C-alpha cells in the first residue's frame, strides 16, 4: 500500500480537509474535558526532523505523537548524518525501516518532496520555504471555532508573500475562504500559487486576491493576519525589509478598516511594533494563543488521518 503524504495543502481534498478539522475539534474537546482518548499510534514511532529551529512545531508534534500513544524521536540535522552530507534519499529509506511516519521541517520544498519520494511511510511537511500546511490547518480550525464557518469568510494577510501566505491561499481556497494578500511590490506570493488558489476557489466559492494596498485588503475583513517580515535565513535583509514593509504593519488603523468583530492572527513568533503593534497583538481581538494551541489539535488529527486505519477513509477521494 502506497503511503499517503502531506506535503502541500492541496494534498487534501475539500471534504478531507473538513473531516480533518472536525476530528481536530473532537480531539480538542476530549483533551479539554479530560476524557479517555483513543491512542491510534500505540506502539508506533514518528521521526521529527528539524533542519530549522522550532518552538511551536517541535513541541506540538512531540506532544501530539505522545498523546496519540506513539513515540516521538526528534532528529536535529546538526546531530545526525543528515547534517554531514548523507543524502535525503538514504535518510528516508533508512528511517522508513525504523519509524511509522516522518515529519520534516526544512528550508527547501525540494527536500520535503525528495524525502517523500524515497520514503515508504507517510511524510509530513512541517514547514518549507514554499508552504506551511500544518500551520494553515490550525489557522482554519481557529477561524472556524470563532466565526462558526469558513466558507465566505474574508481573511486579509498583510506582509511577505511567503510560505505562510501560500498555505493560507491554498488551504483557504479549499475551505471556500476569500484570502486577500497585501504585499509590497516584489514580495507578492508566487503567481502560480495565486492562480491555483483561484482555480480551486472557482469550485469551492473561495477567492485569492493580491494587492499592494494594506487597507484595501483589510477593508471589511473578518480575519486579519500577519507574519514576520524576515524569515529564518533572511536575517541580513532585516533592516531593508523593515523599511519596505512598514506600510503593511498590522496596527490600529488596519483594525479599524476591518469588520467590527474581526479577529487578529499571527503564526508566531511575533516582533511587537514591527509587523504588528503591541496594542493589537495583546488586544481583545487577538487569538494568537488559541491559534498556537490549535497546532497541537490539528496535528493530532493529521497524524490520525494518515496513520489510523479507522479514520483513514473519512472524507476520502
From Swiss-Prot:
Enzyme kind, highest EC tier: transferase
Main localisation: cytoplasm
One Gene Ontology cellular component annotation held by this UniProt entry: cytoplasm
MF terms in GO: amino acid binding; ornithine carbamoyltransferase activity
UniProt keywords, alphabetically: Amino-acid biosynthesis, Arginine biosynthesis, Cytoplasm, Transferase
Subcellular location per the Swiss-Prot or TrEMBL entry: Cytoplasm
EC numbers for this chain: 2.1.3.3
Gene Ontology biological process terms in this record: arginine biosynthetic process via ornithine; citrulline biosynthetic process; L-arginine biosynthetic process
Pathway in which this enzyme or protein is active: Amino-acid biosynthesis; L-arginine biosynthesis; L-arginine from L-ornithine and carbamoyl phosphate: step 1/3
Binding site for L-ornithine: 163, 227, 231-232
Binding-site positions, carbamoyl phosphate: 54-57, 81, 105, 132-135, 267-268, 295
Keyword Amino-acid biosynthesis among record annotations: yes
Disulfide bonds: none
Keyword match Amino-acid biosynthesis: yes
Catalytic activity: carbamoyl phosphate + L-ornithine = L-citrulline + phosphate + H(+)
Similarity comment: family membership: Belongs to the aspartate/ornithine carbamoyltransferase superfamily. OTCase family.
Function field: Reversibly catalyzes the transfer of the carbamoyl group from carbamoyl phosphate (CP) to the N(epsilon) atom of ornithine (ORN) to produce L-citrulline.
Protein name: Ornithine carbamoyltransferase
Amino acid at each position: 500500500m502506497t503511503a499517503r503524504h502531506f506535503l502541500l495543502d492541496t494534498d487534501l481534498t475539500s471534504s478531507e480537509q473538513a473531516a480533518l478539522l472536525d476530528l481536530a475539534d473532537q480531539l480538542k474537546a476530549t483533551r479539554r474535558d479530560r476524557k479517555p482518548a483513543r491512542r491510534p499510534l500505540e506502539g508506533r514511532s514518528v521521526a521529527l526532523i528539524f533542519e530549522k529551529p522550532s518552538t511551536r512545531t517541535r513541541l506540538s508534534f512531540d506532544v501530539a505523537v505522545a498523546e496519540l500513544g506513539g513515540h516521538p524521536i526528534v532528529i536535529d540535522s546538526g546531530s545526525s548524518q543528515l547534517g554531514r552530507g548523507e543524502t535525503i534519499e538514504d535518510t528516508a529509506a533508512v528511517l522508513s525501516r525504523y519509524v511509522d511516519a516522518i515529519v520534516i521541517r526544512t528550508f527547501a520544498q525540494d527536500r520535503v518532496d525528495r524525502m517523500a519520494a524515497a520514503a515508504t511511510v507517510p511524510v509530513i511537511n512541517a514547514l518549507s520555504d514554499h508552504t506551511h500546511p500544518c500551520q494553515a490547518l490550525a489557522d482554519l480550525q481557529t477561524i472556524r471555532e470563532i466565526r462558526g464557518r469558513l466558507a465566505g469568510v474574508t481573511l486579509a494577510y498583510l506582509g511577505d508573500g511567503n510560505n505562510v501566505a501560500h498555505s493560507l491561499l491554498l488551504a483557504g481556497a479549499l475551505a471556500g475562504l476569500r484570502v486577500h494578500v497585501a504585499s509590497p511590490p516584489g514580495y507578492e506570493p508566487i503567481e502560480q500559487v495565486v492562480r491555483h488558489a483561484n482555480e480551486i476557489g472557482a469550485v469551492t466559492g473561495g477567492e485569492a486576491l493580491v494587492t499592494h494596498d494594506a487597507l484595501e485588503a483589510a477593508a471589511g475583513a473578518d480575519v486579519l493576519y500577519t507574519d514576520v517580515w524576515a524569515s529564518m535565513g533572511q536575517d541580513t535583509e532585516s533592516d531593508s525589509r523593515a523599511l519596505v514593509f512598514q506600510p503593511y504593519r498590522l496596527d490600529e488603523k488596519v483594525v479599524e478598516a476591518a469588520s467590527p468583530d474581526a479577529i487578529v492572527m499571527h503564526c508566531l513568533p511575533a516582533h511587537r511594533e514591527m509587523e504588528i503593534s503591541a496594542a493589537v497583538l495583546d488586544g481583545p481581538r487577538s487569538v494568537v494563543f488559541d491559534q498556537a494551541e490549535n497546532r497541537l489539535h490539528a496535528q493530532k488529527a493529521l497524524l490520525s488521518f494518515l496513520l489510523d486505519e479507522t479514520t483513514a477513509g473519512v472524507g476520502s477521494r
